[in-house]
From Swiss-Prot:
Its cofactor is Mg(2+); K(+). This is S-adenosylmethionine synthase. ATP binds at H17, D172, S173, K174, R245, F246, D254, R260, K261, A277, K281. K(+) binds at E45. Pathway: Amino-acid biosynthesis; S-adenosyl-L-methionine biosynthesis; S-adenosyl-L-methionine from L-methionine: step 1/1. Keywords: ATP-binding, Cytoplasm, Magnesium, Metal-binding, Nucleotide-binding, One-carbon metabolism, Potassium, Transferase. InterPro entries: ADOMET_SYNTHASE_CS (IPR022631), S-AdoMet_synt_C (IPR022630), S-AdoMet_synt_central (IPR022629), S-AdoMet_synt_N (IPR022628), S-AdoMet_synthetase (IPR002133), S-AdoMet_synthetase_sfam (IPR022636). Residues 101-111 are annotated as: Flexible loop. It comes from Chlorobium phaeovibrioides (strain DSM 265 / 1930). Pfam families: S-AdoMet_synt_C, S-AdoMet_synt_M, S-AdoMet_synt_N. L-methionine binds at E58, Q101, D254, K285.
């Protein structure tokens, strides 16, 4: 039998990428509101460009937030602290344009006391469909390409902040990983792309010489630390700063907006996406909370050994608590003779996907040991400190199919 062979690519961007600067500011604002008022309704969007930050959106809360202070703190933490970056935490303008949320939306979302079941009182914040996914490619049950891409830029940021080596690094960077699959299994890494912002070349060194130093450093200190050696071979291609000089970057190089990196935030294109961004949205917005819950369902199904891959879709109507539909697809990888229909039937009984049930299960209104800002760079999934990554439903799923 001939082997199937194909290539698949995913990308990531660092915390210093302009869109991620926006995401982190929006989520830091959300963190501040929720810490004061767990019932806050927040839809916060951020725009960043040369020397300027604009924070806007709709809020219903009893909390009081200092937008200037939050934005400057986040920008400082990321590393934009020098005037030469043309986007500096200490000198950039910060404009707040937050205002009250629509009463029409509040009416459908907030608790209806006449309904007996508390979880039926809180409706979905909007209509839409959300997806979750899990697979056996990595220990985190995430697709391999996006996991490696996330780790590359995360390690770059850690090296930059440590300040011991590669001291020329600036905050903005991107990564991309292409994997070769044989018979649906990761066989090797075919290509790695890393573009990182950097200081001007040192005196007495040409641009070509400096780029050669950067290339060597990134391969040795980043790629070889992230990508398993057995996946790299003589034919693996490394594209390091392929356009050459990358001094101008961050919000000075490109305008940043909240919610523009939804594939980076999720599965790197390995799974469908409902289209709704996460950052800046409180957990009553099912764009966020139901995507987290869908990942939780998919991951537990795979962790329970019911399938090697699992896609979960859930959809909602605004103001209605119970999902309009739930769909589970194991991509012909279901085990123990199970069908997708059988898995879905049990999953619907085990996982409550009403918005308030999701919020309570993961404590999304009172985060402990994690923050929304933390989710806003390097992916919302495949990171074990987030509660939706727990696999506490594995035994219950196994028992449902007499596999325990």
């Amino acid at each position: 039998m001939s082997q199937s062979r194909y290539f698949f690519t995913s990308e990531s961007v660092s915390e210093g990428h302009p869109d991620k600067v926006s995401d982190q500011i929006s989520d830091a604002v959300l963190d501040s509101f929720i810490s004061q008022d767990p019932n806050s309704r927040v839809a916060c969007e951020t725009f960043v460009t040369t020397g300027q930050v604009i924070v806007g959106g709709e809020v219903t809360t009893t909390g009081i937030v200092d937008i200037q202070k939050i934005a400057r703190r986040v920008i400082t933490e990321i590393g934009y602290t020098k005037g030469e970056y043309m986007f500096d935490a200490n000198s950039c303008g910060v404009l707040s344009a937050l205002h009250s949320q629509s009463a029409d939306i509040n009416r459908g979302v907030d608790r209806k006391e006449e309904i007996a079941d508390e979880f039926d009182r809180v409706g979905a914040g909007d209509q839409g469909m959300m997806f979750g996914y899990a697979c056996t490619e990595t220990p985190e049950l995430m697709p391999a390409a996006i996991q490696y891409a996330q780790r590359l830029v995360k390690l770059l940021a850690e090296i930059r902040k440590a300040g011991k080596i590669m001291t020329y690094l600036r905050p903005d960077s991107k990564s991309q990983v292409t994997l070769e699959y044989i018979d649906d299994k990761v066989a090797r890494v075919d290509a790695v792309v890393v573009s990182t912002q950097h200081d001007p070349e040192p005196a007495g060194m040409s641009e070509a010489e400096f780029q050669a130093v950067i290339r060597k450093d990134i391969i040795e200190n980043v790629i070889n630390k992230v990508i398993p050696a057995e996946l790299l071979d003589a034919d693996t291609k490394f594209h390091i700063n392929p356009t050459g000089r990358f001094e101008i970057g961050g919000p000075h190089g490109d305008t940043g907006l909240t919610g523009r990196k939804i594939i980076v935030d999720t599965y790197g294109g390995a799974a469908p996406h409902g289209g709704g961004a996460f950052s800046g949205k409180d957990p009553s917005k099912v764009d966020r909370s139901a995507a987290y819950a869908s990942r939780h369902v998919a991951k537990n199904i795979v962790a329970a050994g019911l399938a090697d891959k699992c896609t979960v879709q859930v959809s909602y109507a605004i103001g209605v608590a119970r999902p309009v539909s739930i769909y589970i697809n194991t991509h012909d990888t279901a085990k123990h003779g199970l069908t997708d229909e059988q898995i879905q039937e049990k999953a619907e009984k085990i996982f409550d996907l009403r918005p308030l049930a999701i919020i309570r299960r993961f404590n999304l209104d009172k985060p402990e040991g994690w923050s929304y800002q933390e989710t806003a760079a390097y992916g919302h999934f495949g990171r074990e400190n987030f509660p939706w990554e727990k696999t506490e439903k594995v035994e219950e799923l196994k028992k449902a199919f007499n596999l325990a």
